[in-house]
């Protein structure tokens, strides 16, 4: 099985988890100039951009620790481009950035893991 297929499986698991938590699915694997958005969800009127990370173990800090500052900046840029394509921005839309970290068989949802400020 390819890495891409494995990643897609974890993203689907994350999507279902978030849907059960009450979020609404909008899009997955949105490739934009400068980055990719794993999942785009809605929580009421809030756009939720979700980074899904998987690590087999927490030997090197686990999945959540792998979302570095540089990765955050790429996600912020990709989300800004995505919003601009809809005539919106961080100033005109309610947005948040969540991380759904899967380490081994443990799933951890981190709402508001970082922000655009």
From Swiss-Prot:
Protein name: UPF0102 protein Spro_4337
A Pfam family per the record: UPF0102
Molecular function terms from GO: nucleic acid binding
PANTHER family listed in its UniProt record: UPF0102 PROTEIN YRAN
Taxonomic superkingdom: Bacteria
Family: Belongs to the UPF0102 family.
InterPro entries documented for this protein: Restrct_endonuc-II-like (IPR011335), tRNA_endonuc-like_dom_sf (IPR011856), UPF0102_YraN-like (IPR003509)
